[in-house]
Amino acid sequence: MARIAGVDIPRDKRVVISLTYIFGIGKTTAQKVLADAGISEDTRVRDLTEDELNKIREQLDSYKLEGDLRRETSLNIKRLMEIGSFRGIRHRRGLPVRGQNTKNNARTRKGPRKTVANKKK
């Protein structure tokens, strides 16, 4: 396994797919990185030379990846919660943030149903 940006990427897959194992890199970004490094997308990771791996690492140095990116997103969410914005309140309450309906769905965000017992008449 080749180690790029602190992540072991699979050797038997194509380079484009392997790079997506790094948090913060999708398929489009992987294609752009390989184009800038001058490496074919169809190459397998096991066939890459050390020079090519170093070119990829140099390209990825300009991106915010893995721990830094995770930290930035969590700090952004924390900031929203501290300033008391609508989005921050939704995060704090564990509800959908982007305006989705919560009357029937949103079970992923709300967790399992908490049934309330009926009053006897």
From Swiss-Prot:
GO terms for molecular function: rRNA binding; structural constituent of ribosome; tRNA binding. Residues 91-121 are annotated as: Disordered. The keyword Ribonucleoprotein applies. Residues 106-121 have a biased composition (Basic residues). GO terms for biological process: translation. GO terms for cellular component: cytosol; small ribosomal subunit. Keywords: Ribonucleoprotein, Ribosomal protein, RNA-binding, rRNA-binding, tRNA-binding. It comes from the Bacteria. Pfam families: Ribosomal_S13 (PF00416). Located at the top of the head of the 30S subunit, it contacts several helices of the 16S rRNA. In the 70S ribosome it contacts the 23S rRNA (bridge B1a) and protein L5 of the 50S subunit (bridge B1b), connecting the 2 subunits; these bridges are implicated in subunit movement. Contacts the tRNAs in the A and P-sites. Belongs to the universal ribosomal protein uS13 family. Part of the 30S ribosomal subunit. Forms a loose heterodimer with protein S19. Forms two bridges to the 50S subunit in the 70S ribosome. PANTHER family: 30S RIBOSOMAL PROTEIN S13/40S RIBOSOMAL PROTEIN S18, SMALL RIBOSOMAL SUBUNIT PROTEIN US13M. This is Small ribosomal subunit protein uS13. It comes from Lysinibacillus sphaericus (strain C3-41). The gene is rpsM.
